[in-house]
UniProtKB/Swiss-Prot annotation:
Membrane topology recorded in Swiss-Prot or TrEMBL: Lipid-anchor
UniProt keyword Signal present: yes
Protein name, as recorded: CyanoQ
Example GO biological process: photosynthesis
N-palmitoyl cysteine lipid modification positions: 22
Top-level taxon in the UniProt lineage: Bacteria
Lipid sites, type S-diacylglycerol cysteine: 22
Extent of the signal sequence: 1-21
Length: 149
């Protein structure tokens, strides 16, 4: 009886293995963005684009006025969720675009961190440099995203 159970268990394992290995075809990774995917990405793009506009409208003036307390507050306040939003969006892109988007997002964060340090040190020239570089990388990130037609 125990030999029969062992044999039955072995047969069930083999049948299960064959069924699992043959059951699902390989999923093909898309190479272009579908209109549905672009619409889905636009939900994530909008807050990031608003943050980019806010940088140009508000943060630039704070740096020009050398208002360092409000500069730091703006970086930690309205731009505080930017890291999460940009990395989340980068992860939603096609695999061919993900690495570049993640790299650009990290560069934007690096510039914002250095801008925050420059504001803390009240270093206007370094703050302006980091601000310009952050905008350039931010624009490169946004240009990498698919556009709704």
């Amino acid at each position: 009886m125990s030999r029969l159970r062992s044999l039955l268990s072995l047969i069930l394992v083999l049948v299960t293995t064959v069924l699992v290995s043959c059951s699902s075809p390989q999923v093909e990774i898309p190479t272009t963005y579908s209109p549905e995917k672009i619409a889905q990405l636009q939900v994530y793009v909008n807050p990031i684009a608003v943050a980019r506009d806010g940088m140009e409208k508000r943060l630039q003036g704070l740096i020009a006025d050398q208002n360092w307390v409000d500069t730091q507050t703006y970086i930690h306040g309205p731009l505080g969720q930017l890291r999460r939003d940009m990395l989340g969006l980068a992860s939603s892109l096609l695999p061919k675009d993900q690495d570049k988007a993640k790299t650009l997002a990290k560069e934007v964060f690096g510039h914002l961190e250095r801008l925050d340090a420059a504001a803390k040190d009240r270093n206007g020239s370094q703050a302006k440099i980091q601000y310009q570089e952050a905008l350039a990388d931010f624009d490169s990130f946004l240009n990498l995203l698919p556009q709704a037609s």
